[in-house]
Amino acid sequence: MKEVVVLTFALLSMGSVQAAQDPEAVFNRSCGMCHNGQLPTAPKKGDAAAWQPRLAQGTDTLVKHVTEGFNAMPARGLCMDCTAEDYKAVIDWMSK
């Protein structure tokens, strides 16, 4: 029985995924420099008209743009410790 418990715990810990960071905290730390209006081409938080054509490209494309850099967007969006899940959460938060 002890082996089953140990094996179960080991399997569960291998499959754990790092929880996404707080989107607002990531925005304030990394994204807000450009997305608060200082950079005219960067869509501002909550600007539905600016976000709509970007969201139409799909989340995977937007995450790729953040990760690799796109136009004036620096690679990794200045968040060096963000995961793809973090980027998805921040994109979702910013676009609302």
Positions of the model-derived regions?
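Short sequence/structural segments immediately N-terminal
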Residues: 24-28
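The canonical Cys-X-X-Cys-His
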Residues: 30-37, 90
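Gly/Gly-Pro-rich "capping" loops immediately C-terminal to redox-active cysteine motifs
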Residues: 36-64
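Axial heme c-ligation environment in periplasmic c-type cytochrome domains
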Residues: 42-44, 65-94
